[in-house]
UniProtKB/Swiss-Prot annotation:
Family: Belongs to the frog skin active peptide (FSAP) family. Bradykinin-related peptide subfamily.
Keyword tags: Amphibian defense peptide, G-protein coupled receptor impairing toxin, Hydroxylation, Secreted, Signal, Sulfation, Toxin, Vasoactive, Vasodilator
Protein name, entry field: Phyllokininogen-1
UniProt signal peptide: 1-22
Organism encoding this protein: Pithecopus hypochondrialis
Gene Ontology biological-process annotations: defense response; vasodilation
Location relative to the cell: Secreted
Residue list for modification Sulfotyrosine: 62
InterPro entries: Frog_antimicrobial_propeptide (IPR004275)
Bias-annotated ranges (Acidic residues): 30-42
Tissue expression: Expressed by the skin glands.
Length: 62
């Protein structure tokens, strides 16, 4: 009976460890996706609202 308990605890422990590793990898993947989305949004904002009006040149052309 004690052998069954030990093996059951071992199986449950290993399952818990593998589950937590999978959850950690999933969380890291979601964070990377969020960072990519934030970078894309900031790039789009830079394109939409430039610091200078379109056609503006800081140099004078005579």
């Amino acid at each position: 009976m004690s052998i069954l308990k030990k093996s059951l605890f071992l199986v449950l422990f290993l399952g818990l460890v593998s589950f937590s590793i999978c959850e950690e990898e999933k969380r890291e993947a979601e964070e990377e996706e969020n960072e990519d989305e934030i970078e894309e949004e900031s790039d789009e904002k830079k394109r939409e609202s430039p610091d200078r009006p379109p056609g503006f040149s800081p140099f004078r052309i005579y």
